[in-house]
Regions:
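Carbohydrate-binding surface patches
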Residues: 385-423, 465-466
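Solvent-exposed beta-strand/loop surfaces of large extracellular or lumenal domains
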Residues: 13, 18-25, 431-452
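Aromatic- and carboxylate-enriched substrate-binding clefts and catalytic-loop regions
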Residues: 175-334
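An acidic-aromatic substrate-binding cleft motif
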Residues: 93-172
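Catalytic cores of secreted or luminal carbohydrate-active enzymes
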Residues: 336-380
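N-terminal accessory beta-strand-rich subdomains and adjacent acidic, glycine-rich linkers
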Residues: 1-122
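C-terminal beta-strand-rich structural cap/linker in extracellular carbohydrate-active enzymes
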Residues: 447-472
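Conserved, mostly hydrophobic/aromatic
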Residues: 165, 268, 344, 402
């Protein structure tokens, strides 16, 4: 295959939202009128178009990549776009199967976030490794690396996070980049990992290990020994990092890594990966992937009011939310905006970037610790507008959560009806609102409410709102 001539034509009066970080999907989302996009510009193929004033939303992307490189879009000008196989030259395919090229058209933001075509176009699971897959368990994970990268190099600190994860009620603890420094040799480091796992098991906490894609995992004998060792030690999952590619080889490696991990009952998350293309339907142990401008790129309220309607259409995103103690990452957003991110961005492996003891000291553990990572029901509520405000309601069993992102543009006041709650039921609402004069402050109240009630909410620029409703 030398090229792919597939083209997409979009009316020039639409608004295009796109980003240009093709390697890892961490660029800031840009907004331009489609007719103003310069010819030759290349951007990631999770691009959204909005018809102003018409409530019509279009997404162009792909799904079910197998033995094929990933695609981007090249602007040809005047609303015309061409498939760009940006990370490859000529290549060969066997069997002639190409990925699905997807154009979704939706009439509302709520309809847009419920469009599962990216996932459903991918091949369903068909592998014996996933029979009796009770080892695939979603959950929250403690993570020391974000607060201080040196923490992962200190065995005692990761052991401390075992205890913190237990106290917070998290299912997992992630030992990130640096665990091999626990000893002079990798063999010695694995012995320390076994100590970590033994301690974690006593606390009903599972251990995940970090692994770089730039290391020896390309080498099949090493990779198989690595997986076998992890299974023997009792590791629950692997975080594969530093991928940054959409070559034919790499898109196949995603599949190979997930398949071989499943043979050893290991879950997987991918960091710095390609765009999401429905991989989890084929390989259910792929719990999440980054491919998002998350908290490691510092909080960005304007970007947050776009990503739920672009990136999140591809499924789970490891945004790594909730860190309040690293000022450069908190940036200008409020505490309530950060709490809202934990509800709006979903991930079956949910990496909590803050020290659990700090969340507890700030009185936020009652919201974060019981927070679900899998939802029964989700709604985008009226008043949401891409690039300005996002209003979500989610249900997990008999609990509802509401979350709001405000952009950085201005202070905003809204009335939020609780009509998403079950009629006739009473709820205890735990409500978090912005302190309008203090970015790091927040107001917390508990009140009894029903579906007939509502809340008047005032938000700072880059502010937000979060609430949990427990049926009583």
């Amino acid at each position: 295959v030398a090229d792919e001539p597939t083209q997409f034509n979009v009316p020039g009066d639409t608004v295009c939202r796109y980003q240009t970080d093709l390697k890892k999907m961490q660029g800031k989302t840009l907004t331009k009128k489609t007719s103003a996009l310069p010819s030759g510009e290349i951007f990631s193929c999770m691009t959204a178009f909005e018809f102003p004033g018409k409530s019509i939303y279009i997404m162009v992307t792909e799904s079910d990549i197998e033995n094929y490189p990933g695609m981007a879009l090249r602007s040809l000008g005047a609303g015309r776009f061409k498939t760009e196989l940006w990370d490859t030259d000529k290549f060969f395919i066997k069997g002639g199967k190409t990925p699905w090229r997807i154009v979704t058209v939706c009439r509302s933001l709520d309809q847009l976030i419920h469009c599962r075509v990216i996932t459903l176009a991918a091949a369903p699971v068909n592998d014996k490794a996933y029979e009796n897959a009770d080892w695939i368990r979603p959950g929250k994970s403690a993570w020391s690396y974000f607060i201080d990268e040196e923490h992962s190099r200190r065995f005692e600190k990761i052991m401390e996070f075992n205890a913190l994860a237990q106290e917070a009620g998290y299912e997992y603890n992630l030992a990130d980049n640096g665990w091999r420094d626990w000893a002079k040799t990798e063999r010695g480091a694995f012995k320390k990992v076994k100590e970590l796992v033994n301690d974690a098991e006593k606390r009903s906490v599972g251990i995940w290990l970090w692994q770089s894609a730039m290391d020896k995992v390309w080498f099949t004998p090493y990779r198989r020994r690595f997986f076998k060792k992890c299974e023997k030690l009792g590791i629950k999952g692997i975080k594969l990092d530093h991928i940054e590619s959409e070559t034919q080889f790499m898109t196949e490696f995603y599949r190979l890594f997930a398949r071989e991990a499943a043979e050893h009952k290991l879950m997987v998350i991918y960091h710095n990966p390609q765009k999401p293309t429905g991989l989890r339907r084929t390989f259910p142990n792929v719990m999440s992937m980054e491919a998002i401008r998350g908290l490691q790129c510092k909080a960005d309220a304007d970007n947050d009011t776009i990503l739920p309607f672009t990136r999140m259409l591809g499924g789970n995103a490891d945004y790594t939310p909730l860190c309040f103690s690293v000022p450069r990452c908190l940036n200008e957003v409020s505490i309530c905006h950060m709490l809202a991110s934990a509800v709006i961005y979903n991930s079956a492996f949910f990496t909590v970037s803050e020290d659990p003891s700090i969340l507890k000291a700030h009185g936020l553990d009652s919201f974060v610790s019981p927070l679900p990572v899998v939802w029964n029901e989700t709604h985008v509520l009226p008043g949401s507008k891409i690039g300005e405000i996002v209003i979500f309601a989610r249900r997990s069993e008999n609990k509802w959560y509401a979350a709001v992102f405000n952009s950085a543009q201005s202070e905003r006041k809204i009335n939020l009806p609780f009509s998403f709650l079950k009629d006739g039921a009473k709820y205890e609402a735990e409500i978090y609102t912005d302190n309008l004069t203090d970015q790091r402050g927040y107001n917390k109240v508990k009140i009894s409410v029903t579906s007939a009630d509502s809340a008047d909410i005032a938000m700072r620029p880059s502010g937000g709102f979060a609430a949990v409703f427990r049926e009583i």
